[in-house]
Amino acid sequence: MNTLQKGFTLIELMIVIAIVGILAAVALPAYQDYTARAQVSEAILLAEGQKSAVTEYYLNHGIWPKDNTSAGVASSSSIKGKYVKEVKVENGVVTATMNSSNVNKEIQGKKLSLWAKRQDGSVKWFCGQPVTRNAKDDTVTADATGNDGKIDTKHLPSTCRDNFDAS
């Protein structure tokens, strides 16, 4: 007597489970990178909102604004978002700091900067890892926080990967 086989064998089920596991293992890191990049984009958006005030101050006074107040923008703790702790202006450098919680763990507490340089009668802006500007000689250098304070380059958009010495 022949009986018809109904359903799946144990081997077939194990193969399906293995395939689903492999797909999940590939998709999860890609999704985490995607969420980190989306959260970093909020920091860039908030920081870019300060560019016009900083540029205007520089063009009117010939020096970079020393802080948020002199730039004519809200205090650093008032410029925040869902993923951004603060946006600070210091010697014309706009630095956004990510929150230390409720953010992708790879970017928690990390920073990115927007800074400008005078070139051929205009002001050119750059975006990248955190930098500082020496107010006396107007030089821009990499922030001394080390790698702990830097957002990994893979989480920065391609338009925000300038080196501190870019021109």
UniProtKB/Swiss-Prot annotation:
Ranges annotated as spanning the membrane: 8-28
Propeptide: 1-7
Membrane as UniProt keyword: yes
Record's keyword annotation contains Translocase: no
UniProt xrefs under SUPFAM superfamilies: Pili subunits
Glycosylation (residues): S70
Family listed: Belongs to the N-Me-Phe pilin family.
NCBIfam families noted in UniProt: IV_pilin_GFxxxE
Name of the protein: Type IV major pilin protein PilE
UniProt source species: Neisseria gonorrhoeae
Record lineage: Bacteria, Pseudomonadati, Pseudomonadota, Betaproteobacteria, Neisseriales
